[in-house]
């Protein structure tokens, strides 16, 4: 197998994504007063988006100093980012897990699309909404 230049870019992006998610996880679970579902949401979205996810986290959720989280996330655009992250984390996780499963099973594209849609919806609703929102 011959490596192409894009392979190095992809490898670097994966490393950056893992490091970014590790930073967000450390910061979120070290004392952020955010709900657990949002902590996991930002970690997962950062894992999927890499450094762009860190940028979203720092701009929209990381409190500048202890005790300022509520005031920091009060602007509507930050609440919108939080809502989007919450939804994307649940739905995307279901879709990614379903895509892995359907690829391993070698299912046809129509089944792949259907299973990914159902899994994304179900994972978002039953895990990120019902389970984590308690």
Predicted features and spans:
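Alpha-helical membrane segments of multi-pass proteins
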Residues: 1-134
């Amino acid at each position: 197998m011959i490596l192409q230049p894009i392979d190095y870019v992809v490898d670097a992006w994966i490393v950056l994504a893992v490091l970014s998610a590790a930073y967000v996880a450390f910061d979120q679970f070290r004392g952020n007063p955010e709900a657990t579902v949002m902590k996991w949401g930002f970690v997962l979205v950062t894992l999927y988006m890499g450094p762009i996810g860190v940028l979203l986290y720092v701009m929209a959720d990381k409190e500048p100093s202890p005790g300022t989280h509520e005031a920091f996330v009060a602007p509507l655009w930050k609440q919108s980012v939080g809502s989007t992250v919450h939804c994307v984390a649940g739905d995307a996780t279901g879709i990614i897990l379903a895509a892995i499963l359907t690829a391993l099973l070698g299912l046809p594209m129509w089944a792949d699309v259907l299973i990914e849609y159902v899994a994304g919806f179900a994972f978002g609703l039953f895990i990120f909404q019902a389970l984590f929102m308690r």
